[in-house]
Structures are given as C-alpha cells and as structure tokens.
C-alpha cells in the first residue's frame, strides 16, 4: 500500500467477513449479500454513446419522418423512402432540401416537410456484411441465402470500433433476427482487431505529416514486397513502426526466392519426383518441408499468426542445400528441392500472389497457384 496500488487480483484484506477470499470468490459473496440486503446488485455496464450522426451523404439511409408547420415530427407513411437520383449540388447543404417535389408531402389534407437529414455511414455498416449474402435481391433486405452464410465466421476490424460499430452491428443483427431474416443472435463468431502502422512513434496522419504513400512504395519495390513486409514485421493484432530497412529486407528475400527458382530450373531433372533411393540429407529436407507445411497451415487458419508462418517459410528456404541446386546433383536431391520450392510458393501465395504465380508458371504448372 505504501509503495503503490495493488493492481493484481489478489486476496481481500480489511474487508470484514470477506477477508482472505480471492477476488472472484469475494465478488460472488458480495453480490449475494448486496442482493440479500437489497442495497445493490451485479450489473454489466456498456460503454454506450449517443449515436452522433455524422459523415452524412445525401444518398445515405433516409430518416422516415415528416414535420408539420409547427415543427412536430411524425413517422412517414410512404416507407421505404426512395431518394431522388437527379440532384444538383450547391456545396452548402444537402441537395434534397432544395427539391420541393421531394420535401413537400400532403397527408390527409395537411402539408408536411420531409426530413432531409440522412443517417450516417454507421447505419449501413451495421448490417452490410449481411447484405453481401443477398446482394442482388432488389425486393427485400435479405433472403434465405443469409441464413446459410451468416453469422460471419471471421471479422476483422480496428479496436476503435468496439464502442460504436460493433455494438450497433449486434443491435441490428438482433433486429434482423426478430424479423426472421437471420438465425442466431451474434453477427460475428470471431473477431480480430488489427494493429496500426506507426511512423515516428504515432499513428500515420495527414495533419502530422507522417504519411507514407503506398503507391510510391509499390512503384519502388512492388506490391508483393509491401505485403510481405507488413505481414512479417509483427502479429496482425499488434501495431508496428514503419521501417525502410524492414522493407528492404522483404525485397531481398523475394529476390533470393526468384534466384533460387532460376537455379533450380537450370539444374532441374526432367524425371518424375522419386524418393525411393534418397540420402539422409534429402530426408532431412523433406521432413523440414512437411513440418513447414503443417505449421503454416496452423498459423494461417487457427492462430492467425502470419509473421511466424512467414518465418517458417524463410527457414525452409535457408534449409535447401546449395549442392542440391547443382547440375551434378542427384535426381532425388533435385526432387526434394522441387518439393520444397512448391511448398514455399504455395504457402507464400496468399501473401505475395504476383511473384509466386509467376514462379509457379515458370516451373511448368498451368493452373493458378492461388487455387492449389
């Protein structure tokens, strides 16, 4: 206490009958006593915010309401409200407010003005994932296909959405559930919150002037190099500092991979892959190849640890003996190299699709590598 607050969940002290209890047990006992004394109860508090409607576009979701001459609001009867497409932009306010044929509404002999505000992008983003399942249905929000495809197996988004977008999405999904349009209560089965790319220790921002233009990087290094660097430098859920040295390292590896395939093509055996008579060094390389394939599959699909998957692929690249690339290498040695290279290219193809596809075709494969 004298040195600082105890931050860990530990045993309670100076708490009367709750002394000595662990945090979790004390929590349960205090909850029971509070209920018995009718002085409190357990409650979950969400970080709810008023929906600050912003980022509006005139073509956003219409607000189905009209105002009478007194300014009183009431619900519009002509639902859904269909927005006009022929509009003129003044650059000052919504073009809808200038269109009398849209704004003026007559209901039972009384004149009303239609609400010209629209909901913001959060309204659409709260259920867009569901609409993908019925994207071509212009008669309804969703159809039976939504029940097949939803809920979303894996959702990726920034942690900043935890108190806004992700909560709204759950509200919308449960509304869709109550309408019988989807099944279940949760829209996303798994969530991955990706980290940020930092520059000079802070989030990239135009106002701070620390932006790195990806187009300039692609022009200099190529898209595959940029993709490899971003996926290799850190786990996807952690932020990382932009590094020109790291980018150059990714470029060097891809150049090395290209040269590796060219060396193999120069020494390649035209025979079918045959390992019936192989040496201990061939067995070692083959074991490394299959271990890498198993690890990459687990890192990609279960752990979402792309950086460790790439590290394993690089280790396999380093494990190929130089003598196996010689013209004088034995056929089963060349076969083990081909097996290792195939594994490297297939494993890297989701990360660096362009160079791996080109090398895959150079090896005589006619199919598209991403489909292998």
Predicted features, each with a name:
Residues 1-4, 13-43, 47, 86-121, ...:
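Basic, alpha-helical terminal appendages of large translation-related enzymes
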Residues 51-60, 252-260, 282-323:
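Core structural elements
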Residues 31, 35, 127, 131-134, ...:
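Amphipathic, well-packed alpha-helical segments that form the structural scaffold of globular domains
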Residues 1-78, 87, 208, 213-246, ...:
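Residue patterns forming the tRNA-binding/recognition surfaces of aminoacyl-tRNA synthetases
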Residues 13-16, 33-37, 144-160, 211-215, ...:
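Glycine- and acidic
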Residues 65-75, 80-81, 191, 197-198, ...:
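Acidic, turn-prone loop/beta-hairpin segments
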Residues 35-42, 136-150, 174-187, 220-221, ...:
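Secondary-structure transition/capping motifs at alpha-helix termini
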């Amino acid at each position: 206490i004298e040195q600082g607050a105890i931050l860990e969940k530990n045993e309670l002290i100076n708490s009367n009958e709750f002394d000595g209890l662990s945090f979790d047990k004390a929590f349960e006992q205090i909850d029971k006593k509070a209920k018995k004394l009718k002085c409190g109860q357990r409650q979950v508090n969400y970080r709810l915010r008023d929906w600050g409607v912003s980022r509006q576009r005139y073509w956003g979701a219409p607000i189905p309401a009209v105002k009478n001459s007194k300014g009183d609001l009431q619900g519009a009867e002509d639902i859904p409200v269909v927005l006009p497409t022929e509009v003129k932009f003044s650059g000052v306010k919504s073009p809808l407010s200038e269109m009398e044929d849209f704004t003026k509404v007559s209901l039972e002999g009384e004149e009303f003005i239609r609400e010209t505000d629209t909901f913001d992008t959060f309204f659409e983003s709260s259920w867009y994932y569901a609409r993908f399942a019925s994207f071509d249905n212009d008669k309804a929000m969703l159809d039976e296909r939504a029940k097949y495809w939803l809920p979303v197996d894996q959702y990726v988004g920034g942690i900043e959405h935890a108190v806004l977008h992700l909560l709204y999405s759950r509200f919308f999904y449960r509304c869709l559930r109550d309408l019988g349009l989807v099944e279940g209560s949760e829209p996303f089965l798994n969530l991955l919150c990706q980290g940020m790319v930092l520059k000079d220790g802070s989030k990239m921002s135009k106002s701070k002037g620390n932006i790195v233009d990806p187009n300039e990087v692609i022009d200099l290094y190529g898209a595959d190099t940029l993709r490899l660097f971003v996926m290799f430098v850190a786990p996807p859920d952690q932020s990382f500092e932009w590094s020109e040295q790291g980018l150059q390292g990714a470029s060097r590896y891809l150049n090395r991979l290209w040269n590796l395939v060219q060396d193999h093509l120069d020494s390649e055996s035209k025979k079918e892959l045959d390992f019936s008579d192989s040496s201990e060094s061939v067995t070692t390389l083959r074991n490394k190849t299959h271990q890498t394939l198993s690890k990459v599959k687990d890192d990609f699909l279960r752990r979402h640890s792309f950086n460790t998957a790439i590290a394993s692929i690089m280790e396999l690249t380093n494990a190929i003996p130089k003598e196996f690339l010689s013209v004088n290498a034995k056929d089963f040695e060349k076969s083990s190299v081909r097996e290792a290279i195939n594994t490297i290219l297939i494993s890297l193809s989701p990360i660096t699709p362009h160079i791996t596809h080109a090398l895959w075709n150079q090896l005589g494969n006619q199919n598209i590598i991403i489909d292998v």
